[in-house]
């Protein structure tokens, strides 16, 4: 993305908030102050970003939401993938890997991320008719890998008789 934009003559300023929504708000405020033409955002928490993104839009800055939508801000562009299909593929992989069935954990991303609902829907559809049973479900605020590990440990307190874990985390 960056190299393509630069190749087209755009000046690119990349900021990484590291899962910290307050930091992401500060970064967007910085871009507004710098009067950027376009802000591309992978929202950590769309609800929390609403005011600052609306401010950017009100000042004529184009807003592109990448992977996660920010509700009611009328983004100029929304780029995403088929999240339900992602969940379906994860579910199918577990069904194939565990044909005899058994207990599994479902460790999902952020509870404030609409994509998580879609991934879960696809995942649960893929499990229908299989012998797999979700015995523990957890959600990781801001998609933090550390929370995923915590949820696996909590799940193991419920039962250590598992055959698999679905973890909707990029780490």
Which residues fall in each region the model found?
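A residue-level marker of the well-folded mature domains of exported/periplasmic proteins
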Residues: 1-171
